[in-house]
Design a protein with these regions (language model features):
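Bacterial N-terminal signal peptides that target proteins for export
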Residues: 1-10
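Short alpha-helical segments used as structural interaction elements across diverse proteins
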Residues: 1-2, 61, 283
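Polar/charged alpha-helical tracts
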Residues: 5, 25, 145, 343-344
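Hydrophobic core
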Residues: 11-20
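Hydrophobic alpha-helical membrane context
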Residues: 16-17, 76, 290, 298
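Active-site-adjacent loops and short helices of periplasmic peptidoglycan-processing enzymes
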Residues: 21-177, 181-190, 195
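Domain-terminus/edge residues, biased toward the C-terminal soluble/receptor-binding domains
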Residues: 156-160, 168-173, 177-377
Length: 377
């Protein structure tokens, strides 16, 4: 377990604060039961827990976070509207398995972009990804190409999409860290967060149906309609996924007080209960354990004080002063173990030049400070 923190703060006459890392020995490892897992503090991007986060794995329907992101970005650009009517085509429905997640949309049926997004994000309907992808890019293949392009733009190093849905296919994979990068971008969209937090949603009759559709969330952390016993206070979405190849997957976030955590759990198992009465879906239980571990063990702590004198730097070419006092431009916090003594942190100052040249104004950058703990930086 490692904690990484980039504090992008310019200091008054000095300093950009660098990486803060706490070694694994600082806290007891929660030993998450999954192929890969990641826990990140949302505001700072601090990695609180990581397990195999760069491994290339099947990710099932967590793929749909990217599919939805592209649609919301298209809406922002004015290329689509939430109230826009879209008609399902035969090509969009072709090749989807009958036993996959579906909203039972048929060829020629018309729904709005908003309704299709709810189908995608609440019940994980596969056909909606193809329908919206075809609408946006002209073909499903073109939409998949755009998914891969966007992944690269977001900095994903271990991701390749072969379809819009997450159905098992050669060349379709991602990693826990890459899914976090995609999710971090998606949650910037308010409507995305509204949809992934929706417990149930009703779609009125369409041109092809006489009855309304009632959608119930697949996410047992926020809804017990499908699975009972997993509700987590403060949980906010985000996306479930499950295939034989991927196992049980879940990307989620949770809020407690002023803190928000984002978790990714991939390749968890479905374990039979000891009494044989059913199964435990460990993507939910392990995510809940991750959240509890993060909230219980970490809190923001101040690592730099804007009023603190860091050091004095010699000044050349000045008749008025021989040194200049170096202070942080602003205070800086980092997400740290609650029981960590901040005085144990090590600060290393690296000056751009050993001597500052006049004239010097308040707020000028003179170098960099790295805050570290133990033997890691």
């Amino acid at each position: 377990m490692k904690i990484r923190r980039f504090i992008a703060v310019f200091l008054s006459a000095l300093i950009l604060c660098g990486v803060l890392t706490v070694p694994a020995a600082a806290l007891e490892d929660p030993a998450i039961r999954a192929k890969a897992a990641l826990l990140v503090e949302a505001e700072t991007g601090t990695v609180l827990y990581d397990k195999n986060i760069h491994d290339e794995l099947s990710i099932a329907s967590t793929t749909k976070i990217m599919s939805a992101l592209l649609v919301f970005e298209a809406i922002d650009r004015g290329e689509l509207r939430l109230d826009q009517q879209v008609t399902a085509t035969a090509t969009a429905l072709r090749g989807l398995p009958e036993d996959g997640s579906t909203a039972d949309i048929v060829e020629g049926e018309t729904l709005t972009v908003e309704q299709l997004l709810y189908c995608m994000l609440v019940i994980s309907a596969n056909e909606t990804c193809n329908i919206l992808g075809e609408t946006l890019c002209g073909s499903v293949d073109a939409f998949v190409a755009r998914m891969n392009q966007r992944a690269q733009e977001l900095g994903c190093k271990n991701t390749h999409f072969a379809n819009t849905t997450g159905l098992t296919q050669s060349g379709h994979y991602s990693s826990a860290y890459d899914l976090y990068l995609i999710t971090r971008e998606a949650i910037k969209h308010e409507d995305f967060m509204t949809m992934v937090n929706t417990k149930s949603y009703e779609i009125p009759p369409t041109n092809k149906t006489e009855e309304e559709r009632v959608l119930h969330s697949t996410n047992a952390l926020i809804s017990n309609w499908r699975l009972a016993g997993y509700l987590y206070s403060g949980a906010q979405g985000i996306k479930t996924g499950s295939t034989d190849a991927a196992g049980q997957c879940l990307v989620s976030s949770a809020v407690r007080g002023s803190r928000t955590l984002i978790s990714v759990v991939l390749g968890a198992e479905k374990v039979e209960k000891e009494n044989g009465s059913g199964y435990i879906v460990e993507s939910f239980t392990e995510t809940a354990r991750l959240f509890d571990w993060g909230f219980d063990n970490f809190a923001p702590q101040q690592v730099l004080d804007e009023n603190e004198l860091i050091q004095e730097v010699p000044v050349a070419l000045s008749k008025q002063v021989s040194t200049v006092a170096v202070h942080p431009a602003e205070s800086a916090d980092a997400m740290l173990p609650k029981d960590l003594d901040v005085s144990a942190l090590t600060r290393t100052v690296t000056l751009d030049n050993e001597t500052a040249l006049a004239p010097i104004a308040a707020g000028d950058r003179l170098g960099e400070i790295t805050v570290s703990y133990g033997d890691t930086t």
